[in-house]
Structure formats: C-alpha cells, structure tokens
C-alpha cells in the first residue's frame, strides 16, 4: 500500500470509491469536483489517498481552521478493509497536521 497526497486528478477515482461505500453521505455542491478542488486548494497537505493494486482503495480528507484539525470524508473500498488502510490514512493526517502546527484534531 502507498499513501500519497490527494490531488484533483484523483477526484473521479475517489468519487467512485465514495459511491461504493454504504452510508457515505455526499453533498451535491460540496462534494462536486469543483467543491473538492476548492477544498484541496485550501488544504493541500492534509488530504490523502491510499493505492493498492494500482488503484485508489482509500481516502481521507482533512482540513484546519488554524487552531484545530478536522477529519471529513474517510473511506476504504469494502474489498480492502481490515488491512490497516484507514489507520494508515489517519496516521498520515495526524502527521500532516503536526507538521503545520495543529495539535488538536
């Protein structure tokens, strides 16, 4: 598994992943490609995707208000669960938040 920063180029794969996860509540405006691109521009260092078998199998999006960090959409492909992917994504966010001076998430 490889964890990398999410970019706008990952949007279609991430959106497909979100749709594959039961109970994933999506908002037409905020979770549109344009909405996610704006979020990534504001939070370029705190959103990540997990790759395995050359495809996106996990995602985590997080942001900060300058004092606290917030974790938003976190999802793992149902066929790849129970492999530590979500834990690795959360660890990546926690490290990224620490690097930008955010200690409360």
Regions found by a protein language model. Give the residues of each.
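Conserved beta-strand in the GNAT
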Residues: 49, 55-63, 70-75
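Conserved acetyl-CoA-binding loop-helix of GNAT-fold acetyltransferases
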Residues: 76, 82-95
């Amino acid at each position: 598994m490889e964890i990398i920063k999410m970019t706008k180029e990952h949007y279609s794969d991430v959106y497909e992943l979100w749709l594959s996860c039961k109970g994933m509540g999506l908002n037409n405006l905020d979770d549109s490609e344009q909405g996610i691109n704006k979020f990534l521009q504001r939070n370029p260092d705190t959103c990540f995707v997990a790759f395995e078998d050359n495809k996106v199998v996990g995602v985590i999006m997080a942001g900060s208000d300058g004092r606290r960090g917030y974790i938003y959409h976190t999802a793992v492909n149902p066929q790849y669960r129970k492999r530590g992917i979500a834990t690795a994504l959360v660890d990546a966010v926690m490290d990224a938040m620490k690097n930008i001076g955010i200690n409360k998430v």
